[in-house]
UniProtKB/Swiss-Prot annotation:
This is Amine oxidase [flavin-containing] A. Residues 520-522 are annotated as: Interaction with membrane phospholipid headgroups. The keyword Mitochondrion applies. The gene is MAOA. The modification N-acetylmethionine is found at M1. Keywords: Acetylation, Catecholamine metabolism, FAD, Flavoprotein, Membrane, Mitochondrion, Mitochondrion outer membrane, Neurotransmitter degradation, Oxidoreductase, Phosphoprotein, Transmembrane, Transmembrane helix. It holds the Pfam family Amino_oxidase. Residues 1-497 are cytoplasmic. The record marks C374 as: Important for catalytic activity. Its EC number is 1.4.3.21, 1.4.3.4. It is a single-pass type IV membrane protein.
Length: 527
């Protein structure tokens, strides 16, 4: 009776309702609209963009306080943004990057800081090589089907790091690598999931690099424009301040209800929100047990994104580009990038407070965070000019109730093999998008576009408008942002690990001892 009453009161009938007005949901809606499908996007916030958010004010002009970076091999977001009339610019790494470790700053160039200790170098080299080799054994579209899935999914990344690395230097940087890439701790995440995550982003070098990597570029005017321009195209088919609370697909049409009791009827639904947020929605019939269990087991990463503005880019006077990799437990920030505008105006440094540090520093006042960051930059860059910013912007994604955190949801140990296969499995006429469901650059804007367009094509296939083989389409490489192959040198490919070196030394010692024993024996027998 209740369903019939809701159906009678539903004032809007559409073909598809998309839950979530981030890049993924809007990409889905845009594609459906191009096929003549009557689509409606319901967004909980008073803005579109989801985990991308461009703030505009007189102090910053514009600033991305959420997802911002694009680069080679991220061909879908590059194609979509170009279609929407957006341009990219390169993040500055013309000068030296800085590694800060044990209270000292070391300038360097390249993706990773150099290591001068030969044993630590072997350890580092083996870490990246082993992670990439393990990733090659994981299918991007079905990591749970990896030959080692069960074994690796029972391990945390801390377990794996402890297993691979011998030196404290390598272990410390490997932990930072996890913090930076997935905004969570090594002991929290499944080794299988993290290895898959790095693999589907192109490997350890591609995911971590600025040049030829995931952080090479930003959008002129901000990444929020992607969603804003799609909303402009869709017009009144995007509704803000409409959190969805109820989805009933027990009848011929699906009934969708929002928090303010607006009712909509449709044939299909796309859920384009983080998996854990679907727990805020009441479903009828109830979700299948595996899906219900999955959404309770995928926490979000923790991050506070901080932008410090200065009168001038003083770091360039020291031949620094603004990128800092900071290995210090007491430091609030773990990594920074230059966030100066492409025309050189509004000099700024963007820094991430990550994982355990985000949790700790979220408890203090904004001004305390600002002071701690300024003190840190002054130490790392060796300049008191860092202590005198002209403006500070930040965004604590941990307090966003309609995101739950950033960048992405992560899989704790055991979850990928037990429940992972249902991540994008439709439930009746409900299909799932969101960057977490992507198979390339999941966690990035690229993954959001892939997932949204794939979910849209699943519905188009159900409607008989595209064939099943066209649900998953290969994206041509961007002509504007070409990707260059990442290769390893002969030594990077062939140097032994520390364990391998010890075995070589042990074998050599044994052979030498045996030779000496034989030599002495011969001398004795001759005499």
């Amino acid at each position: 009776m209740e369903r019939q009453e809701k159906a009678n009161n539903a004032g809007h009938m559409v073909d598809v309702v998309v839950i979530g007005g981030g890049i993924s949901g809007l990409s889905a809606a845009k594609l459906l609209n191009e096929y003549g499908i009557n689509v409606l996007v319901l967004e909980a916030r008073d803005r579109v963009g989801g985990r991308t958010y461009t703030v505009r004010n007189e102090n910053v002009d514009y600033v991305d306080v959420g997802g911002a970076y694009v680069g080679p091999t991220q061909n879908r977001i590059l194609r979509l943004s170009k279609e929407l009339g957006l341009e990219t610019y390169k993040v500055n790494v013309n000068e030296c990057l800085v590694q800060y470790v044990k209270g000292k700053s070391y300038p360097f160039r390249g993706a990773f800081p150099p290591v001068w200790n030969p044993i630590a170098y072997l350890d580092y080299n083996n870490l990246w090589r082993t992670m990439d080799d393990m990733g090659k054994k994981i299918p991007a579209d079905a990591p749970w089907e990896s030959p080692h899935a069960e074994e690796w999914d029972k391990m945390t990344m801390k377990d794996l790091i402890d297993k691979i690395c011998w030196t404290k230097t390598a272990k410390r940087f490997a932990s930072l690598f996890v913090n930076i890439n997935v905004t969570s701790e090594p002991h929290e995440v499944s080794a299988l999931w993290f290895l898959w995550y790095v693999k589907q982003c192109g490997g350890t070098t591609r995911i971590f690099s600025v040049t030829n990597g995931g952080q090479e570029r930003k959008f002129v005017g901000g990444s929020g424009q992607v969603s804003e321009r799609i909303m402009h195209l869709l017009g009144d088919r995007v509704k803000l301040r409409c959190p969805v609370t109820y989805v009933d697909q027990s009848g011929d049409n699906i009934i969708v209800e929002t928090l303010n009791h607006e009712l909509y009827e449709c044939q299909y639904v796309i859920s384009a929100i983080p998996p854990t947020l679907t727990a805020k929605i009441h479903f009828r019939p109830e979700l299948p047990s595996e899906r219900n269990q999955l959404i309770q087991r995928l926490p979000m990463g923790a991050i506070i994104k901080c932008m410090m503005y200065y009168k001038e880019a003083f770091w360039k006077k020291k031949n620094y580009c603004g990128c800092m990799i900071i290995e210090d437990e007491e430091a609030p920030i773990s990594i920074t990038l230059d966030d100066t505008k492409p025309d050189g105006s509004l000099p700024a440094i963007m820094g991430f407070i990550l994982a355990r540090k985000a949790d700790r520093l979220a408890k203090v006042h904004k001004e305390v965070r600002k002071r701690k960051i300024c003190e840190l930059y002054a130490k790392v860059l060796g300049s008191q000019e860092a202590s005198h910013p002209v403006h500070y912007e930040e965004k604590n994604w941990c307090e966003e109730q309609y995101s739950g955190g950033c960048y992405t949801a992560y899989f704790p140990p055991g979850i990928m093999t037990q429940y992972g296969r249902v991540i994008r499995q439709p439930v009746g006429r409900i299909f799932f998008a969101g960057t977490e469901t992507a198979t390339q650059w999941s966690g990035y804007m690229e993954g959001a576009v892939e997932a949204g367009e794939r979910a849209a094509r699943e519905i188009l296939n159900a409607l008989g408008k595209v064939s099943k083989k066209d649900i998953w389409l290969r994206e041509p490489e961007s002509e504007d942002v070409p990707a260059f192959e990442i290769t390893r040198t002969f030594w990077e490919r062939n140097l032994p690990s520390v364990t391998g070196l010890l075995k070589i030394i042990g074998f050599s010692t044994s052979v030498t001892a045996l030779w000496l024993a034989v030599y002495k024996f011969r001398l004795l027998t001759r005499s």
